[in-house]
Amino acid sequence: MSKLSLALTNTTLGIPVTRLISPWLLDLGGFHGLTLFEMGLAMVAFGFVFALPLTTPPRVKWIGPLDIVSYLLIAIGFGAIAVALSLGRIYWWFEAPWLGMLFALAVICLTLAVIVELHRDSPLIDIRWLTSPATLHFAGAILLMRIVLAEQTVGASNFFQALGIQNEQTMPLYAVILCAILAGGLTCALLLRPGRENWFYGTALACVALGAWLDSGATSLTRPHDIRLSQALVAYGSGLFLPAAMAQGMGGVITRGPIFILSFITVFLFTQSIGGLLGSALFGSFITLRTAFHFNVLAERSEERRVG
């Protein structure tokens, strides 16, 4: 359990680490230097994959021709949703017709994938298990939690971007966030045991709620050092949430057999990736609307003063 907690914690460190090192890389070589560094990290990771191979698991001939069809339909559906959610607030939802086409394509592809899987004797993904009340409850809970956690990655960064605060000024804040995530992961590694997942969910949600409440009083005078405590609480909650969710889900799947592992991975990846993008789209769109509203109010007041 401790190894799983630490491994999942490492997957959440990307954003704070990026915020810490990207200002220096941008100063050295601009976006070219930043992307070059990313390519270097990918090559190093690629080398480690071959230098430190995992133990080969037992292999069973399982993949069939229809599995490829189902996989392609699911991949296209998820990909279309991801692209639309990522670019919706940039091109704006009602201004770009192709965003609606992407959502329609996603619905068609995922519907076809469900139809194919329901009529197979050995499905790639067990749709009936995915639509069971227990699975829907689990998926809905972690999806909502993932949407809430997007407040930190989008809300705080876009807020300071709207205020004109540079990346260098937010580096101490993201250092605090990084330490809080690590603290959450270490807490899970030390205390998380089967049957304790709900306590971790409750603690994570309480931390996020308290942090969001503290941030609700932010104004145009708020600076990064003013929200270190609140963002640390949100980060600590995110560090508690992911290992507990994976531990609870995997524990139930392993008892049912290895056939359900792929179905669980599909649910987990969907809720985490699509949930994160959905949260970013919701918070980003809200910030865009409120920013435009306040700009219009300021423009009207300026015009009234000029006329008066």
Regions found by a protein language model. Give the residues of each.
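Alpha-helical transmembrane segments of multi-pass secondary-active solute transporters
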Residues: 3, 34-37, 101, 170, ...
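Membrane-helix boundary/linker segments in multi-pass transporters
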Residues: 50-63, 83-170
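Alpha-helical transmembrane segments
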Residues: 32-42, 97-107, 227-236
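12-transmembrane solute porter fold
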Residues: 123-293
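Helix-loop-helix hairpins in multi-pass membrane proteins, especially solute transporters
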Residues: 1-69
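Structural signature of transmembrane alpha-helices in multi-pass secondary transporters
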Residues: 4-15, 70, 74, 145, ...
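Cytoplasmic-side transmembrane-helix entry/capping segments in multi-pass membrane proteins
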Residues: 3-9, 63-72, 128-131, 198-205
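Conserved small/polar residues in nucleotide/adenosyl-binding loops
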Residues: 305-307
